[in-house]
Amino acid sequence: MPVASLHIARYPLPTALRSAVHVWLRRADFENTPGLAIGALFNTADFWTLPSPKFNLRRYAILCCWEDEAAFDTFMDGSPLIEAFHRGASETWHAKLEPATVLEGQWRGWPDESAELTPLEDDDPVCVMTYGRVPIRQTWTFWRANGIVVRQARENPAMLGWLGLADRMGTASTFSVWRSVAEAKTFAYGPGDHAPVVRPSRTVPWLENRFFARFRPLSSAGTIDGRDPVAEALSRDLAATPSPG
């Protein structure tokens, strides 16, 4: 069964760029990591800055898809890349995820094993990844619409965390953590400020090379801005599970 992981590190400003370069220079070793199906280093952005996200030059992320859980464990237990990624960081976080559904598109050949995956229930916590390349002609339209979505997301108690990502120039990606699948669906497709943004985006492609996937959060460690949104989501899920007997 494939396993995904997201790794985030924040560095002191004087050493942030140097730390990112050290990781980037190890990309060949990273690509040859045993059991790694696909992976990439991302810049991150704060989506709370409007009208467009502001890149956070102190924080970087690595997203991976592993052939199985054993490959992920080996990576975490002593990979030179993860050691370089953590070196000098003032804050680190990672989450282990189970790919659940690829709803649209493909990212860097991400394996689509939907037929073998356990489907998510509406009350399960969920992590959602969106990805796409913003055509130059759609840049203003896209970021104006993004402002509408961000304002609503900030006020939604079901969203426990949201991070902007970019692995290449001109791409826009988000990774968000939700209390439940049902609440994530309501935000994306239900009535509200998001609906007028979603409908026209289907007829006028604001994003090219789109990718939209959901993940089941399995575990996490560390913090992002002093919090662990996946741990919060899992603790809520455990609290909602009735005790046997």
PLM region spans:
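Alpha-helix boundary/capping residues
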Residues: 78-80, 191, 201
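Extended repeat-based interaction scaffolds and adjacent low-complexity, acidic/S/T/P-biased segments
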Residues: 63-65
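Helix-loop elements that line ligand-binding/catalytic pockets
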Residues: 175
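Short S/T/G/P-rich N-terminal loop/turn motif that feeds into the first structured element of a domain
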Residues: 1-60, 69-75, 88-172, 182-190, ...
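Flexible helix-coil linker/hinge segments at domain or subdomain boundaries
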Residues: 205-207
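Acidic/histidine-enriched, beta-strand-rich ligand/metal-binding domains
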Residues: 166-168, 197-203
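A common structural junction motif
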Residues: 80-89, 195-196
